[in-house]
Amino acid sequence: AIAGEAAALGVELFVLDDGWFGLRDSDSSGLGDWQVNTDKLPGGLEALVPRINGMGLSFGIWVEPEMVSEDSCLYRSHPDWAFRIPGRLPARGRDQLVLDFSRREVRDSVYGQLKKVISSAPVAYVKWDMNRSLTDVWSAALPAGQQGEVFHRYVLGVYEILERMRQDFPDILIEGCCGGGGRFDGGMLYYTPQIWCSDNTDAMDRLRIQYGTSFCYPTCTMGAHVSAVPNEQNGRITPLAARGIAAMSGAFGYEMDLSRCTPEEKDEIRRQIETYKTHWKLFHQGDYYRLTDPFQDGPFTAWAHVSPDRRKAVVSLVAGPAQTAPPFLALRLKGLDPGLRYRINGASASGGDVLMNAGYPLPEFRGDYQAMQLYLEATE
């Protein structure tokens, strides 16, 4: 039902999240056993993926290869493959331990399982997750005098297995994730050109998160999704328009059960997807301009994506809580050609110099967290 609704609304990729493998019936079991649970998915991916593809959707899958559950076949067979300081109980995070990816035999075992699963069906996307920090970093394969090397060896091991995946599956998009953006860095971006920016999907918090991340990384690398409300992290309720516009400043998607949406919400989602597809080149290849600083607690946050030739732009704005008798507000744009005139949302035209100096007059926002977009195109 979810996939069918997604396809009808214009979604292009359907991702199967945690729980599809081993005896993964809770957070405390199954990690490390990367075989499809055929009780949950009869016929495996070989049966599921063609059905998804038949709806016009590509298929993606979630994995967390660096972790292991103590309640797993892998751990019971090889308890020494997990980081653990001799003579001490290990520190658990999310009821899981960290596999020693500094060891070739560990990487070979895990990757062999993953390769078999991914090869079984036309997988287009892999979300590579990592949901706890490294503790008890002690490798059973190295003497005490070399334990200081383990952190570095571990990272090289992660890179090595990702490189193997890239070589074996060059057409698959790998998205990195680490409890959100905990491992958002240049090294991982080489292997995973898209990284989940944060597990905090609240639209208002994301304005700050994505603003800060943009100082180091292109917006097209930031995984950014619309999620359900009340938001599961903070309980905030924001309009669907605000959530959609906030997510469009990154690698856009939806993290919610679309089959539960109202007809009005589905219409809005369809429009958002059409907008993102129409302006995809601008969002991913245009020049990014920060028009306001969300850390200054102003009345709104705004940004723009401008084409390199400065003839087109998408300006996005999300307002904060509503104000009684608000002052007149104008948004000064950036990146336009001062000598050109721009048609705004297909209607009236204004000069680039006017829009960048006097600004675009904003409407009065009634209600909390209102949002809008301006679509600019040069008239000459």
Task: Please annotate each region the language model reported.
Residues 124-135, 175-182:
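Short acidic/histidine-rich active-site segments
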Residues 294-337:
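Carbohydrate-binding surface patches
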Residues 352-380:
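C-terminal beta-strand-rich structural cap/linker in extracellular carbohydrate-active enzymes
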Residues 74-108, 152-259:
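Glycan-recognition surfaces
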Residues 14, 52, 110, 174, ...:
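Conserved, mostly hydrophobic/aromatic
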Residues 1-112, 125:
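Aromatic-lined carbohydrate-binding/catalytic grooves of carbohydrate-active enzymes
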Residues 334-348:
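Solvent-exposed beta-hairpin/edge-strand motifs
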Residues 241-292:
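Catalytic cores of secreted or luminal carbohydrate-active enzymes
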